[in-house]
Amino acid sequence: MNVLEIGAGGREHALAYKLNQSNLVKQVFAIPGNEAMTPIAEVHTEISESDHQAILDFAKRQNVDWVVIGPEQPLIDGLADILRANGFKVFGPNKQAAQIEGSKLFAKKIMEKYNIPTADYKEVERKKDALTYIENCELPVVVKKDGLAAGKGVIIADTIEAARSAIEIMYGDEEEGTVVFETFLEGEEFSLMTFVNGDLAVPFDCIAQDHKRAFDHDEGPNTGGMGAYCPVPHISDDVLKLTNETIAQPIAKAMLNEGYQFFGVLYIGAILTKNGPKVIEFNARFGDPEAQVLLSRMESDLMQHIIDLDEGKRTEFKWKNESIVGVMLASKGYPDAYEKGHKVSGFDLNENYFVSGLKKQGDTFVTSGGRVILAIGKGDNVQDAQRDAYEKVSQIQSDHLFYRHDIANKALQLK
């Protein structure tokens, strides 16, 4: 079959790589893709992921059987709806169901109504009310901007001054807009991907752990993710089972009950507190960089899993008996202002590297984004995989990238 993958980042590179491995897939197309994907997919960088009509025309022209949507923006903009209305099979939720990521308030209200464990929250609609609220709220407080923010719309404020600064960042020059304040939760964070079709929820039996902060020791601002690893040895199967029972199954049923038909992968960003797992966030797609490490470890056929889900079957995932560690290299300055156009070399176009922000300039690759390339390490355990990942990092040549040196350290300290 012909499969069209939407998106241009490292997550989409990993999806294209995994789909290309499937015996069920004859050809992978990528829109817009990136030039590092050319060994595994027919890449069409001339088409934008926001040009829904051009994507539809392409899918018709190429007799596409399935469309797999990677990033959140096309989902929230309704690309899946347009494709389905024209008879195409799509892995990814419709516009209404994608609100679970598109609006933090939407997600909080559903969790509140159906008693799904999450932090207590307070919504405000005006800047002056936000500034009033923080004068007496418990610190630290989590400040979240409603809507999409590429993983960077969350600030944890330890002081009133930091909370005021967060509000200024969230509102800018505006006086109105929805901001959600949450009680700060302490515990171990983890990411659980769950395949969902209506009230059928099939969670991965392998979780990943992301590293959101820009710098070592979890310092600096939040980013889209500076690395990840799987499995997570210090989070037990019992915790995964409990997360499935108290979060994954209930949220699938709740969404359907509210009239939202979710079909795709639901990312559950959770935290293991002393009172059990609680939801930090939901995403309507694979995490990035969690997808890169999870799909690298997945032994079974991703396309078969998608078809099984479409047919309402409780698909069974199979995993390689190894650990995977992914280390992200980013442009210096990220997640704030950064330069583009700097040469990067030393990497191969294979399963050891997934590209997020590079483009071809002649025969060389140059930086084109904040997060640039993820190096993948594999090993019999986390320690060996971590060593392998940093060996892969050391092969990359560039004076304009930085990376964290402590990805997966937590697993080694807590094992």
Curated annotation (Swiss-Prot):
GO MF entries: ATP binding; metal ion binding; phosphoribosylamine-glycine ligase activity
Species assigned in the record: Staphylococcus aureus (strain MW2)
Record bears the keyword Metal-binding: yes
Gene name of this polypeptide: purD
Alphabetized PROSITE patterns for the sequence: ATP_GRASP, GARS
Superkingdom of the source species: Bacteria
Cofactor binding note of this UniProt entry: Binds 1 Mg(2+) or Mn(2+) ion per subunit.
ATP-grasp domain residues: 108-311
Protein name: Phosphoribosylamine--glycine ligase
Keywords (A to Z) from UniProt: ATP-binding, Ligase, Magnesium, Manganese, Metal-binding, Nucleotide-binding, Purine biosynthesis
Cofactor(s) annotated in UniProt: Mg(2+); Mn(2+)
The enzyme's E.C. designation: 6.3.4.13
